[in-house]
From Swiss-Prot:
The gene is CIMAP1C. This is Protein CIMAP1C. Belongs to the CIMAP family. It comes from the Eukaryota. Residues 172-201 are annotated as: Disordered. GO terms for cellular component: cytoskeleton. STPGR repeats lie at residues 171-186. Residues 191-201 have a biased composition (Polar residues). It comes from Bos taurus.
Length: 201
């Protein structure tokens, strides 16, 4: 490669020759690195209300932020803080997870209060479930009066016996059937030859 005439030093494209600075072995140049976490930001007065990231009253303008967040609830922040840089969401009640709802959103309490009443609960109609009268008990049978749903319904005895004879159900077992003997009433039933066990009612 031939150099142009008049050029004594072969330095290309604006390169400057390196200056050799003599460095002694005892003197080394030490530079302290800049820790960004130690730098202070503009301060908490930048925004109207301090953030709740990391811990309560955390300075959001600091460069270093903690790795966790305490969810402190500021109910007045969403109403008063109109200059906050964070997003503010106003949810439309008609939007559901399936899209825009076409029907009006009515609370369930209003649905229940507007339900039509059954015909037997209207005024002037007879009540189906009537309370059974209290029966006097002997001192040996004294117990607290327990009213069940079966006792509150007054069924005619004829209808109950007709159902038991039609279904082949035997009357309530006596003490002899509980002890292992078959009652005479059960032998008269057409279902007496079945292998069903006798249950006490």
């Amino acid at each position: 490669m031939k150099l142009p005439k008049g050029v004594k030093n072969p330095v290309f494209y604006g390169q400057q020759p390196e200056k050799k600075v003599p460095m002694s072995s005892g003197h080394e140049i030490k530079q302290t690195p800049v820790v960004l976490a130690m730098l202070k930001g503009p301060g908490p007065a930048k925004y109207l209300r301090p953030s709740c990231t990391g811990y309560i009253d955390h300075d959001v303008s600091m460069f270093q932020e903690p790795a966790y967040t305490l969810h402190a609830w500021h109910p007045e922040k969403r109403i008063m803080d109109i200059r906050s840089p964070g997003p503010c969401y106003f949810l439309d009640p008609k939007i559901t997870r399936f899209g825009m709802a076409s029907c009006p959103q009515v609370p369930m309490a209003e649905h229940i209060s507007n339900l039509p009443w059954p015909p037997w609960t209207r005024t002037g109609s007879t009540r189906i479930c009537q309370e059974a009268p209290d029966r006097p008990h002997t001192p040996g049978q004294s117990r607290p009066s327990i009213r069940t749903a079966a006792l509150s319904i007054a069924w005619p005895n004829a209808l109950a016996t007709r159902w038991t004879t039609h279904l082949g159900l035997a009357p309530a077992p006596t003490m002899s059937s509980r002890s292992g003997h078959t009652s005479p009433a059960r032998l008269l039933s057409p279902w007496a030859s079945s292998t069903r066990p006798t249950y006490a009612r």
